[in-house]
């Protein structure tokens, strides 16, 4: 199985509104009529001004079954977890236990960013309020 690159975008505007967008190149040798997690709101993409904006990349079937993006938001809203705690819980203790791999990029209503993954690497970047760009590939960076 070889995955194509996926573009995940999440943003917070000056008024505090959150947005998420996810685009995918799909999966090589995918099954005919397969729909991945990217176009499914709550699985691969989700935004809620009260909590966070999340975009996901990974093995879509597991992200759909786990409703990854919405689940992170729900853990923040109902359990009071931080975006980092919620993302870790979903990616490592839900998706991974089902056999799925991948990660998420997200931003919460306060501008805190998560880039959580259960894979050795995931192309990701963020820009801070001063315009400094931070680009990472491997998990230990």
Regions found by a protein language model. Give the residues of each.
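C-terminal beta-strand edge segments of enzyme domains
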Residues: 114-141
């Amino acid at each position: 199985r070889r995955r194509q690159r996926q573009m995940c975008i999440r943003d917070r505007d000056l008024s505090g509104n959150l947005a998420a967008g996810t685009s995918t190149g799909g999966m090589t040798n995918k099954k005919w009529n397969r729909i991945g997690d990217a176009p499914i709101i709550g699985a691969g993409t989700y935004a809620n001004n009260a909590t966070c904006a999340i975009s996901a990349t990974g093995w879509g079937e597991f992200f759909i079954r786990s409703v990854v993006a919405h689940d992170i938001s729900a853990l923040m809203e109902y359990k009071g977890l931080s975006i980092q705690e919620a993302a870790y819980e979903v990616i490592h203790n839900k998706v991974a236990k089902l056999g799925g791999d991948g990660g998420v990029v997200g931003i919460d209503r306060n501008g805190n960013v998560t880039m959580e993954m259960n894979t050795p690497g995931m192309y990701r970047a963020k820009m801070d309020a001063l315009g400094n760009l931070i680009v990472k590939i491997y998990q230990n960076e």
